[in-house]
Amino acid sequence: MKVTLKELSQLLGATIKGDATLEITSVATLEDATQGQLSFLANSKYRAQLEATQASAVLLSEKEASCYHGNALIVSDPYVGFARVAQLLDTTPKETPGIHPSAQIDTSAILGDGAAIGANAVIGANVILGENVQIGPGCVVGESSIIGSNTRLWANVSVYHNVHIGHDCIVHSGTVIGSDGFGYANERGNWVKIPQTGGVRIGNHVEIGACTSIDRGALSHTEIHDGVIIDNQVQIAHNVVIGQNTAMAGGSIIAGSSTIGKYCIIGGGSAVAGHLSVADGVHISGGTNVTSVIREKGVYSSATIAMENKLWRRNTVRFRQLDELFSRVKTLEKSAKGSE
């Protein structure tokens, strides 16, 4: 696919600097770009690469464009502009519309126009697939589940029964949606399983990475709202609610019945304990353990930073002595006041 700078300027609302008829075929970094490619400068620390780039054109802010002598598209946010152009020129392979001969589809399932069902996929009873849904090889969609139009399941995704996924979503390989939540009652030391009879409700424009697990609700539903992005190997337990446009990085864990607000960022390897709520706009740093309610937006951290091992060992010992040291300081303060 080829597109001119003029066409891209119309897409982005950008100002053209240079040849409006120049054709672009793909995007690349400043360092790797060659003729026919569009690049971008979103961080001034890469300005030296801008001067040396072989890109045919560059997405720039107005400030950076004033010092650049090549072809440019001037935008308010070059990184967002890059994302939009990358979407336009995306060459990711798509499933061919139609049903592979090895796919197993229940006669009660409803398939929208343009749906693509890959090899060895299984579509259960009363499933509804919207228009242009892509179901990759080896996927399973359980009974009474609904998948909205233009949503794609990559190979080997498992969607259990009573799961609703909205339109324009992406679910990557190995992910499981709707497995049983970790619900058990303890009867004199023996675990009694609680049937997980809720479902999962996923909104529109949601992307879920590879090998992520989203448990079904115990009674009500687990909910992932519109615009949420979830990385690889994330665990979302039963009855969790993830608010609109929240981002969750790899390896993060949300325990059962916790609610995460809108526009939050959950850093990689972080964990939120069960039955808690996190306010809108909260940024949880990577590796943080959240064990109490967060009521106000802001950045929250708890992980110990990496340090040389000997220093870490000494500090760990001191941390264990912290309560004793605090008591000693209080005693010294009282003694000092008494001697005044």
UniProtKB/Swiss-Prot annotation:
It is an enzyme of class 2 (transferase). Keywords: Acyltransferase, Lipid A biosynthesis, Lipid biosynthesis, Lipid metabolism, Repeat, Transferase. GO terms for cellular component: membrane. It catalyses: a UDP-3-O-[(3R)-3-hydroxyacyl]-alpha-D-glucosamine + a (3R)-hydroxyacyl-[ACP] = a UDP-2-N,3-O-bis[(3R)-3-hydroxyacyl]-alpha-D-glucosamine + holo-[ACP] + H(+). InterPro entries: Hexapep (IPR001451), Hexapep_transf_CS (IPR018357), LpxD (IPR007691), Trimer_LpxA-like_sf (IPR011004), UDP_GlcNAc_AcTrfase_non-rep (IPR020573). One of its GO terms (molecular function) is N-acyltransferase activity. CDD domains: LbH_LpxD. Its EC number is 2.3.1.191. Pathway: Bacterial outer membrane biogenesis; LPS lipid A biosynthesis. Pfam families: Hexapep, LpxD. GO terms for biological process: lipid A biosynthetic process. The active site is at residue 238. It comes from the Bacteria. HAMAP family: LpxD (MF_00523). Homotrimer. Belongs to the transferase hexapeptide repeat family. LpxD subfamily. Catalyzes the N-acylation of UDP-3-O-acylglucosamine using 3-hydroxyacyl-ACP as the acyl donor. Is involved in the biosynthesis of lipid A, a phosphorylated glycolipid that anchors the lipopolysaccharide to the outer membrane of the cell. This is UDP-3-O-acylglucosamine N-acyltransferase. It comes from Shewanella frigidimarina (strain NCIMB 400). The gene is lpxD.
